[in-house]
C-alpha cells in the first residue's frame, strides 16, 4: 500500500491577479517595497528572478514583485494597495519604496505618473534602459526634481544612452550613484548580462 502524499506547503505569497506576488513580513508597519524588474532572462520572467535578490529583504519589508516588465504599473500598484487595505490584512506601510530594474523603467513611469514621486520615500534606479528620448527625458527630469530620494546603480552599457546615464549619475552625486564594473578573473572577464544582473546585488545594499 502506497504512503499518502504529504500535503503541499501553503503558498507564502499573496497573488495580485495578473500583476505579481506580494510578501508580507511579520511587522505590519514595515516599509513596502514595490519592484518592477526587466525583460525575461533565459526564458525566466522577472517575477521569478527578482526574488533571487529580494528574498534577502523579507524579514524587513513587505515586498511586491511584478510578474514581468509588461504589467501596467498603475494597475499593479493599485492592486497591491487594495490588497493591503482588505479587512483581514489591514496593513498601512510606514513608507513606500520604488525599485526599478532594467526594463522596469516602463511600469515605473506608469506608477510615477499616476501616483506621483511624492508617494515614495525612496526611488531606486537599477541599470534601467533609457534608449528612447522620451524615456531619457523622463528620468532626467525625475533626477532633477527628486535627487534627494533617488539612488542610481548602473553599468556602462545598461542605459543604452551614455549621456543620460552620466547626467543622472552626476546629478545624484557619488554618494547616491554606483557604477558597477565587470569582474575580471585573470584573463576571464564577466559577461555583460552577469554584470547587468549583479547591479541588483549592489542596489539592495541601499535598502
Segments from the language model and where they lie:
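A domain-start/cap signature at the N-terminus of enzymes
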Residues: 1-32
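Alpha-helical scaffolding within the catalytic cores
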Residues: 19, 45-56, 79-83, 108-112, ...
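C-terminal catalytic histidine-bearing segment of alpha/beta-hydrolase fold enzymes
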Residues: 20, 151-207
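Conserved hydrolase catalytic core segment
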Residues: 110-121
Amino acid at each position: 500500500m502506497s504512503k499518502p502524499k504529504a500535503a503541499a506547503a501553503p503558498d507564502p505569497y499573496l497573488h495580485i491577479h495578473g500583476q505579481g506576488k506580494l510578501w508580507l513580513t511579520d511587522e505590519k508597519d514595515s516599509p513596502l517595497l514595490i519592484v518592477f524588474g526587466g525583460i525575461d532572462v533565459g526564458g525566466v520572467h522577472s517575477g521569478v528572478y527578482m526574488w533571487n535578490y529580494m528574498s534577502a529583504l523579507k524579514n524587513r519589508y513587505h515586498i511586491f514583485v511584478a510578474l514581468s516588465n509588461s504589467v501596467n504599473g498603475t494597475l499593479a500598484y493599485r492592486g497591491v494597495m487594495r490588497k493591503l487595505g482588505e479587512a483581514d490584512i489591514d496593513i498601512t506601510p510606514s513608507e513606500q519604496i520604488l525599485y526599478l530594474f532594467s526594463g522596469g523603467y516602463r511600469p515605473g513611469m506608469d506608477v510615477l505618473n499616476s501616483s506621483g514621486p511624492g508617494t515614495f520615500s525612496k526611488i531606486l534606479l537599477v541599470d534601467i534602459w533609457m534608449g528612447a528620448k522620451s524615456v531619457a527625458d523622463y528620468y532626467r527630469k525625475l533626477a532633477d526634481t527628486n535627487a534627494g530620494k533617488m539612488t542610481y546603480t548602473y553599468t556602462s552599457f545598461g542605459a543604452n544612452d551614455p549621456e543620460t546615464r552620466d547626467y543622472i549619475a552626476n546629478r545624484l552625486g557619488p554618494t547616491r550613484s554606483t557604477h558597477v564594473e565587470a569582474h575580471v578573473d585573470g584573463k576571464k572577464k564577466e559577461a555583460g548580462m552577469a554584470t547587468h544582473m549583479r547591479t541588483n546585488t549592489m542596489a539592495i545594499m541601499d535598502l
